């Protein structure tokens, strides 16, 4: 029987940070936990970052993942929102590396392509595919589903058939190696 790997996926946000924990055995994915870390909207940024760091630390301590994956920041129309999101993401990364976890990063496009099959998928499509892929009886909250989708993306890219077919990690794009 294949060894099990536990992966923590994080969808960072300054107000709500979603997380998802899955186990991967061979080509099978199993739901462990998911949830949302909510920060007080009226709290100063430093306090909100402290909440994110503390709660991600608790998730790591309780569920003991061996690997972590975080969604990268996308550039928003509002520069202030992008900066806030970047700071929340930095808090998540700091919490993970302080627990000595290897961290991989994926763009929203990569997550949607891995889970749904197309990069322009709607949040509802991501939620639906997370439910299907993990055999869940209910639909997780959108941010928690995104955290699970990030974990699934990491599993599919590093533990699934794609990793076995391309162990070097090299990607071919339009006939060129990158």
From Swiss-Prot:
Keyword Membrane (UniProt): no
Binding positions for Mg(2+) 1 per the UniProt entry: 11, 143
Leading EC class: hydrolase
Transmembrane segments annotated in the record for this chain: none
Keywords, ordered alphabetically: Cytoplasm, DNA damage, DNA recombination, DNA repair, DNA-binding, Endonuclease, Hydrolase, Magnesium, Metal-binding, Nuclease
GO cellular component: cytoplasm; Holliday junction resolvase complex
EC number(s) on file: 3.1.21.10
GO molecular function: crossover junction DNA endonuclease activity; DNA binding; magnesium ion binding
CDD domains according to UniProt: RuvC
Similarity remark: Belongs to the RuvC family.
Name recorded for this polypeptide: Crossover junction endodeoxyribonuclease RuvC
The organism of origin for this protein: Neisseria meningitidis serogroup B (strain ATCC BAA-335 / MC58)
């Amino acid at each position: 029987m294949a060894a099990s790997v536990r992966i923590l996926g994080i969808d960072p946000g300054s107000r709500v940070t979603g997380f998802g924990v899955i186990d991967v055995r061979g080509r099978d994915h199993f739901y462990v936990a998911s949830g949302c870390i909510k920060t007080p909207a009226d709290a100063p940024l430093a306090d909100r970052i402290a909440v994110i760091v503390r709660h991600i630390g608790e998730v790591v301590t309780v569920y003991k993942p061996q690997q972590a994956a975080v969604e990268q920041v996308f550039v928003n129309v509002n520069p202030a929102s992008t900066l806030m999101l970047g700071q929340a993401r930095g808090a998540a990364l700091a919490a993970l590396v302080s627990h000595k976890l290897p961290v991989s990063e994926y763009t929203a496009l990569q997550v949607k392509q891995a889970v749904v099959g197309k990069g322009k998928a709607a949040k509802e499509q991501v939620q639906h595919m997370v439910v299907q892929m993990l055999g869940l009886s209910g639909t997780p909250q959108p941010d928690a589903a995104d955290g699970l989708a990030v974990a699934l993306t990491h599993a599919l890219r590093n533990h699934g058939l794609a990793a076995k077919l391309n162990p070097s990690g090299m990607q071919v794009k339009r006939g060129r190696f990158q």
